[in-house]
């Protein structure tokens, strides 16, 4: 079937990119549980430049509320400790040799509600991005049909596919949000 250069898979890729971004943003929201991903944004001043923590140490979760950071180079322990303290994550490392232990404090009810609001904001921004992708796709289809590059039937069929992809992506966003909300509110 002629699609006049219209690629539904490209639209789906753009929509998936938005949900991947949401997953990353939601992963950065600190819940009461320890997760190695909490330290992904930490940059360490090392060897004359800023390096991601995961290039200098191994992060593990030995207990649900404890992170363990095993620094590979003994000379970098202080720099890693400073980077974690300066990261605004609210974590205070306890250093034992080349291992830093980070206790994850309990979240109070007010902070949990704030985090849920932030998660909702991220999800809404993702929904808006997905709708923009849908609008771009539908505009392209209208142009192609207007220029007689595709038939009206093809335009309607492809528009229906675009809507199906949008609905599926929005559903995925809602599921990601619900899971994160449950994780945040679980004491």
From Swiss-Prot:
One annotated GO molecular function: ribosomal large subunit binding
Primary localisation category: cytoplasm
Keyword presence, Nucleotidyltransferase: no
Coiled-coil regions listed: none
GO biological process, one term: cytoplasmic translational termination
Upper taxonomic lineage: Bacteria, Pseudomonadati, Pseudomonadota, Alphaproteobacteria, Hyphomicrobiales
SUPFAM superfamilies: Ribosome recycling factor, RRF
Record organism: Rhodopseudomonas palustris (strain BisB18)
UniProt protein name: Ribosome-recycling factor
Pfam families, alphabetized: RRF
Statement: the UniProt record of this protein carries the keyword Ubl conjugation: no
Name of the gene this protein is made from: frr
NCBIfam families to which the protein is assigned, alphabetical: frr
Family per similarity comment: Belongs to the RRF family.
Record keywords: Cytoplasm, Protein biosynthesis
GO annotation, cellular component aspect: cytosol
Job of this protein: Responsible for the release of ribosomes from messenger RNA at the termination of protein biosynthesis. May increase the efficiency of translation by recycling ribosomes from one round of translation to another.
InterPro entries with a match to the protein in the record: Ribosome_recyc_fac, Ribosome_recyc_fac_dom, RRF_sf
Subcellular location as annotated: Cytoplasm
Matching Gene3D superfamilies: 3.30.1360.40, Ribosome-recycling factor
């Amino acid at each position: 079937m002629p699609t006049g250069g219209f690629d539904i898979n490209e639209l789906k890729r753009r929509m998936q990119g938005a949900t991947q971004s949401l997953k990353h943003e939601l992963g950065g929201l600190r819940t009461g549980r320890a997760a190695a991903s909490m330290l992904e944004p930490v940059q360490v001043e090392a060897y004359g430049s800023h390096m991601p923590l995961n290039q200098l140490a191994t992060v593990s979760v030995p207990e649900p509320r404890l992170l363990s950071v095993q620094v590979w180079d003994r000379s970098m322990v202080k720099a890693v400790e400073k980077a974690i303290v300066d990261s605004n994550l609210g974590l205070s490392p306890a250093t034992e040799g080349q291992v830093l232990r980070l206790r994850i404090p309990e979240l109070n009810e007010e902070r949990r509600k704030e985090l849920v609001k932030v998660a909702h904001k991220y999800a809404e921004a993702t929904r808006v991005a997905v709708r923009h992708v849908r609008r771009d796709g539908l505009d392209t289809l209208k142009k192609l049909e207007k220029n007689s590059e595709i038939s009206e039937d093809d335009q309607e069929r492809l528009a229906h596919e675009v809507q199906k992809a949008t609905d599926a992506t929005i559903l995925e966003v809602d599921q990601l949000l619900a899971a994160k909300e449950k994780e945040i509110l679980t004491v």
